[in-house]
Amino acid sequence: MTTPLMHSSIKSLKLINQGKVRDIYDIDDRHMLLVASDRLSAFDVILPTPIKDKGAILTQIANFWFEKLKHIVPNHLTGIDPNTVVKDPAEQAQLGPRALVVKKLKPLPIEAIVRGYLAGSGWKEYQASQSVCGIPLPAGLQEAAQLPEPLFTPSSKAEVGDHDENITLEKCAQLIGPELADKVARVSVQLYKEAAAYALGRGIIIADTKFEFGLDEAGELYLIDEVLTPDSSRFWPQDQYQVGSNPPSFDKQYVRDWLESTGWNKTPPGPALPDEVAARTADKYREAFERLTGKPF
């Protein structure tokens, strides 16, 4: 039985960044070590209760998609075993299936969001303006409706604890250049369409998702970070989907619902989760992995 990992401690390498979930260590000028912890954030606040096996599940779901979608765009995987980089047995014990050695690339300063259904902030904006990220949509759409075509709706990257901001396609082009913005939009929609069609066959609707990209020294585009996981996507069970209502998602829904019921003001520090809420959340992550891959975790 694995012990949940809240924070990694790899003293043999230099910690260069700690995100909401991942700890990133410097290996050399071409490689980094990513360690996906069992931290859980909700409402942009990291909660004090870890979710068992979450980091390993996220890493293995992302690896599954990286392999399945590599014909569309190259990715940051190297195939290098983390245990060949980290030699100390106590440090190796923190790695296992949660760790990856990846290419060191220059990340683009945008999140590449693709929406296939009207949900979350997109639904709120549609109600106010009949558009999403400034893109006009037909009248009369209901919550959770499938959009006529998947939409590329980028956002700016925020620091940990801040909210990402939706940006227009014009602003995206200003940030990364029009040619690259067009390529990112095209690749993102292609990734989404292929993944959504596959997932639907496994009983999961991918309502929306967030991709991240980086460039190598030659300017080639790579898919980086995590891909099509319950943390970066809104997964709905197909058998519970109904237009006009917000389906339960395969991620932090139990946690969000419980937090809403506590009256917590959504600012740090977050409250500790009851065992039942943490366990049901862990079950949902595991179910997403098993449904998508067809393998037991």
From Swiss-Prot:
GO terms for biological process: 'de novo' IMP biosynthetic process. Keywords: ATP-binding, Ligase, Nucleotide-binding, Purine biosynthesis. Its EC number is 6.3.2.6. Coiled coil: none annotated. Pathway: Purine metabolism; IMP biosynthesis via de novo pathway; 5-amino-1-(5-phospho-D-ribosyl)imidazole-4-carboxamide from 5-amino-1-(5-phospho-D-ribosyl)imidazole-4-carboxylate: step 1/2. GO terms for cellular component: cytoplasm. GO terms for molecular function: ATP binding; phosphoribosylaminoimidazolesuccinocarboxamide synthase activity. The keyword Ligase applies. PROSITE patterns: SAICAR_SYNTHETASE_1, SAICAR_SYNTHETASE_2. It catalyses: 5-amino-1-(5-phospho-D-ribosyl)imidazole-4-carboxylate + L-aspartate + ATP = (2S)-2-[5-amino-1-(5-phospho-beta-D-ribosyl)imidazole-4-carboxamido]succinate + ADP + phosphate + 2 H(+). NCBIfam families: PRK13961.1 (NF010568), purC (TIGR00081). Belongs to the SAICAR synthetase family. PANTHER family: PHOSPHORIBOSYLAMINOIMIDAZOLE-SUCCINOCARBOXAMIDE SYNTHASE. This is Phosphoribosylaminoimidazole-succinocarboxamide synthase. The lineage of its organism: Bacteria, Pseudomonadati, Pseudomonadota, Betaproteobacteria, Nitrosomonadales.
